[in-house]
């Protein structure tokens, strides 16, 4: 049972990786560009709010 499970998992992983790599090479550029733009806007807003809170706390503590 253990040998059969390990073998099946290794085969499924290899097939999944091969299919993913072939598709990712072609579609990865457009997807990463769209994702990076969306994530950058979200991260900038979150980072600015978080940084302001952090700096305000640090400034109050330091002063």
From Swiss-Prot:
What GO biological process, any one, is recorded here? Answer: sperm DNA condensation
Protein name per the record: Sperm protamine P1
Any single Gene Ontology cellular-component annotation: nucleosome
The entry's function note states:
Protamines substitute for histones in the chromatin of sperm during the haploid phase of spermatogenesis. They compact sperm DNA into a highly condensed, stable and inactive complex.
User: Where is it made, tissue-wise?
Assistant: Testis.
List every stretch annotated Disordered: 1-63
Tell me if Nucleus is a UniProt keyword of this record: yes
Subcellular location(s) of the protein: Nucleus; Chromosome
Q: Which InterPro entries match?
A: Protamine_P1 (IPR000221)
UniProt similarity note: Belongs to the protamine P1 family.
The Gene Ontology terms for molecular function here are: DNA binding
Grouped into one coarse class, the protein's main location is nucleus
Keywords per UniProt: Chromosome, Developmental protein, Differentiation, DNA condensation, DNA-binding, Nucleosome core, Nucleus, Spermatogenesis
Q: What is the lineage of its organism?
A: Eukaryota, Metazoa, Chordata, Craniata, Vertebrata
């Amino acid at each position: 049972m253990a040998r059969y499970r390990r073998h099946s998992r290794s085969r499924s992983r290899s097939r999944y990786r091969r299919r993913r790599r072939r598709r990712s090479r072609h579609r990865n550029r457009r997807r990463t560009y769209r994702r990076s733009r969306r994530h950058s806007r979200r991260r900038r807003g979150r980072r600015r709010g978080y940084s302001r809170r952090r700096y305000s706390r640090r400034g109050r503590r330091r002063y």
